[in-house]
Amino acid sequence: MAARKTAKSARSTKKTKRAPARAKAKAAPRKSGNGGDSLALRSASPSFTVNDLDRSLGWYRDILGFAVEETWKDDEGRVMGVSLKAGDVSFMIGQDDWKKGRDRAKGEGFRIYCETRKSVDDLAKRIESNGGRLDSGPTNQPWGVRDISLTDPDGFKITIARAR
């Protein structure tokens, strides 16, 4: 019996080896604990700097059907920016002020993705009848939407989609 106790005692005091900290798998990103509400954001409205505000405003208003929600003028009364709205979506376009560094190419690497409750086919017909040109669509996508894509006068890409 004494031998048994000794073996048992030896087993219970045996230390287990742990992998070094650097060999552990990467930890998952830490959750904020507040459900992502640390900023208490209510909305987000992108703002695009455009080369010709009148041309862009006409395109969004007359081709796509956005409504002007608000305008901003400079000290001389020139419109320098507008807020546009269609349904629950709003964004702003503003005249490029041509300051150093602002003469960059517009619209590169950026796409506005909008979801609609309307028929994408009907929207495509309306856009084309208003003088707009589609880049693609209407197309059934493998992820379960039907969409159209177009490009505004400054190169910003827009996709309008509806779930099938």
Where are these regions (language model features)?
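Short acidic-aromatic low-complexity motifs
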Residues: 49-54
